[in-house]
Amino acid sequence: MASSISTGVKFVPEEDNFLQRHVAFFDRNKDGIVYPSETFQGFRAIGCGYLLSAVASVFINIGLSSKTRPGKGFSIWFPIEVKNIHLAKHGSDSGVYDKDGRFVASKFEEIFTKHAHTHRDALTNEELKQLLKANKEPNDRKGWLAGYTEWKVLHYLCKDKNGLLHKDTVRAAYDGSLFEKLEKQRSSKTSKKHP
């Protein structure tokens, strides 16, 4: 796949921009641009299978590339510019990221105050379905599908043995720290299997 021209300078997401931090995990070479191959590698690193990783890399990069590259022509490499990821924010979401990609604590808390009825700090699968239904905006199939897919993959990867998706896990997904944790867990499991 394509790689960007290296300037020797690594891209560092803005500290208060949770959306940039979320996406930066997938920027495997830390140059500020995420190519489909990096999206694939990132999904594999957090424990997704080949098929899900391949499908995710195609749909995510095709869907977000042009939105994060305003004023630039079409690229067959479908790069995503991390610094502009806020321009690709989809509808039918929770509102936890504001228009600039910053974390909105009140919207995050609202997820659990409105939808976590069984356990105060966790969502059941049924409560997750209700959250997705509540977030759905009229005539926004693409945004709803994006949100649905994000939440379902998160639930699949991170639910506990009782099927609960915990508040601290969801917050870590929003700021991107969850991905680093999952990658470390996966690599330690792999190293234990192959000493």
Swiss-Prot record:
Reactions performed catalytically: RH + ROOH = ROH + ROH
Phenotype seen when the gene is deleted: No visible phenotype, but increased sensitivity to exogenous abscisic acid and osmotic stresses. Increased drought tolerance.
Domain notes: Transmembrane regions are predicted by sequence analysis tools, but these regions probably constitute hydrophobic domains associated to phospholipids.
Sequence motif Proline-knot, location on chain: 70-79
Subunit text: Homodimer.
Organism for this UniProt entry: Arabidopsis thaliana (Mouse-ear cress)
Protein's job: Calcium-binding peroxygenase involved in the degradation of storage lipid in oil bodies. May be involved in the interaction between oil bodies and vacuoles during seed germination. Acts as a negative regulator of abscisic acid responses in non-seed tissues.
Pfam families given in the database record: Caleosin
Residues binding heme, per UniProt: H22
Record's protein name: Probable peroxygenase 4
Gene Ontology CC: lipid droplet
SUPFAM superfamilies (alphabetical): EF-hand
Cofactor(s) of this protein: heme b; Ca(2+)
Keywords: Calcium, Heme, Iron, Lipid droplet, Metal-binding, Oxidoreductase, Phosphoprotein
Domain EF-hand span(s) in chain numbering: 14-49
Regulation: induction: Down-regulated by abscisic acid and high salt. Not induced by salt stress or desiccation.
Tissue and organ distribution: Expressed in roots, leaves, stems, shoots, flowers and germinated seeds. Barely detected in dry seeds prior to germination. Preferentially expressed in vascular bundles and in guard cells.
Family assignment from sequence similarity: Belongs to the caleosin family.
Cofactor: how bound: Binds 1 heme b (iron(II)-protoporphyrin IX) group.
The EC number(s) this enzyme carries: 1.11.2.3
Subcellular location as annotated: Lipid droplet
Binding-site list for Ca(2+): D27, N29, D31, E38
Phosphoserine: modified positions: S177
Single annotated GO MF: metal ion binding
